[in-house]
């Protein structure tokens, strides 16, 4: 992929996670791998910049996706309560949509002067608010 990206002066965008900023018990393997993506973003941006290849990372907060819905993760009352609790720890009071993440990715694809960036698109989840 490096040869193609160099030829096209392309862009590589990783998807990280707020699990690298907030501790969610039981998510250690997921958090570790997503955290590694942020470091990889910066290292690859430094290594590939001279070839005009941009490398960035988007860090979403909670996002309601079709995969969640198809898996039935929000079908029962307990699941609906989890969804409400998740929304309450975002500063904007709701979880995000796939389109909002796509818009951030679109920005990074077009932003020719941006590389090595870790863009938090998390509705304020990374601020550390609680639902007390």
What are these regions (language model features)?
Residues 1-9, 111:
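A short helix-coil junction within the Rossmann-fold of NAD(P)-dependent oxidoreductases
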Residues 3, 46-50:
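Alpha-helical segment proximal to the catalytic Tyr-Lys
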Residues 17:
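Residue(s) in the substrate-gating loop at a strand-loop-helix junction
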Residues 21, 59-71:
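Short, flexible catalytic-loop segment of classical short-chain dehydrogenase/reductase
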Residues 22-28, 50-51, 93:
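Active-site loop immediately N-terminal to the catalytic Tyr-X3-Lys motif
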Residues 33:
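Active-site helix of classical SDR
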Residues 49, 54, 115-116:
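Short, small/polar-rich loop/turn modules that mediate ligand/substrate recognition or access, typified
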Residues 94-121, 126:
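C-terminal substrate-recognition "lid" of short-chain dehydrogenase/reductases
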């Amino acid at each position: 992929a490096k040869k193609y990206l160099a030829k096209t002066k392309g862009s590589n965008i990783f998807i990280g996670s707020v699990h690298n900023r907030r501790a969610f018990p039981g998510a250690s393997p997921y958090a570790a791998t997503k955290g590694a993506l942020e470091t990889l973003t910066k290292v690859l941006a430094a290594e590939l910049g001279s070839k005009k290849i941009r490398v960035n990372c988007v860090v979403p907060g909670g996002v309601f996706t079709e995969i969640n819905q198809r898996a039935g993760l929000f079908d029962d009352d307990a699941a609906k309560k989890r969804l409400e609790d998740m929304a309450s720890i975002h500063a904007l009071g709701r979880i995000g949509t796939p389109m909002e993440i796509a818009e951030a990715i679109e920005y990074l694809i077009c932003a020719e002067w941006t590389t090595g960036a870790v863009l938090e698109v998390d509705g304020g989840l990374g601020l550390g608010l609680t639902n007390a």
